[in-house]
């Protein structure tokens, strides 16, 4: 059975299969932001090729999440899954969030304005390389910039209205808050 690959743009990367565990087909899974006990509640997961992965059993052992998937019954089959990224649909997440809470996936595509209401671009990614969360912003000049995802750099987020506000100086984009407009216009004129 396969999942519709066209829907991957609405997918949320939930976990990555790290290694085989034992001889019965179990795998060690790295969860990305999800709590281990919630993993099984999501039901069927899928990979980027549309293959489905139904969780048969799951346990936590020494800070590892050990999962057995339906149809994965031996170590060699489990070893072949190393590195597989597992996804769920965005609508499988609970929406009972507080007004100042949101999922990272919901930031992708938001319009980005500066604190003078000048359009800077659009959020195109969300990363954490170990030193803190970063937003990837595709500027109107088509360049991309990584900015710190902090209250100082991103003082306002309105997911429902489809935008967020960035302080360009606090975000490290420019030392002079007025230099963005000149830079963006120059980049657009150069083509």
Curated annotation (Swiss-Prot):
Q: Which residues form a coiled coil?
A: none
Q: Name one GO cellular component term.
A: cytoplasm
Q: Does the keyword Cytoplasm apply?
A: yes
Q: Which UniProt keywords apply?
A: Chaperone, Cytoplasm, Ribosome biogenesis, rRNA processing
Cite the Gene3D superfamilies for this sequence. PRC-barrel domain, RimM
Q: Which InterPro entries match?
A: PRC_barrel-like_sf (IPR011033), PRC_RimM (IPR056792), RimM (IPR011961), RimM_N (IPR002676), RimM_N_sf (IPR036976), Transl_B-barrel_sf (IPR009000)
Subcellular location per UniProt equals: Cytoplasm
According to the entry, every stretch annotated as the PRC barrel domain falls at: 99-172
Disulfide-bond pairs as recorded:
none
Q: Extract one GO BP annotation from the record.
A: rRNA processing
Pfam families tied to this protein: PRC_RimM, RimM
Q: Does Transport show up as a keyword for this record?
A: no
Query: The organism sits in which domain of life?
Result: Bacteria
Main localization of the protein? Answer: cytoplasm
Q: Membrane-spanning residues where? A: none
Q: Tell me a Gene Ontology molecular-function term this record carries.
A: ribosome binding
Q: What is known of its domains?
A: The PRC barrel domain binds ribosomal protein uS19.
Q: Assembly and interactions?
A: Binds ribosomal protein uS19.
Outline what the protein does.
An accessory protein needed during the final step in the assembly of 30S ribosomal subunit, possibly for assembly of the head region. Essential for efficient processing of 16S rRNA. May be needed both before and after RbfA during the maturation of 16S rRNA. It has affinity for free ribosomal 30S subunits but not for 70S ribosomes.
Tell me its family. Answer: Belongs to the RimM family.
- PANTHER family assigned to the protein according to its UniProt record, in alphabetical order: RIBOSOME MATURATION FACTOR RIMM
Q: What is this protein called?
A: Ribosome maturation factor RimM
- Which organism was this protein described from? Bartonella bacilliformis (strain ATCC 35685 / KC583 / Herrer 020/F12,63)
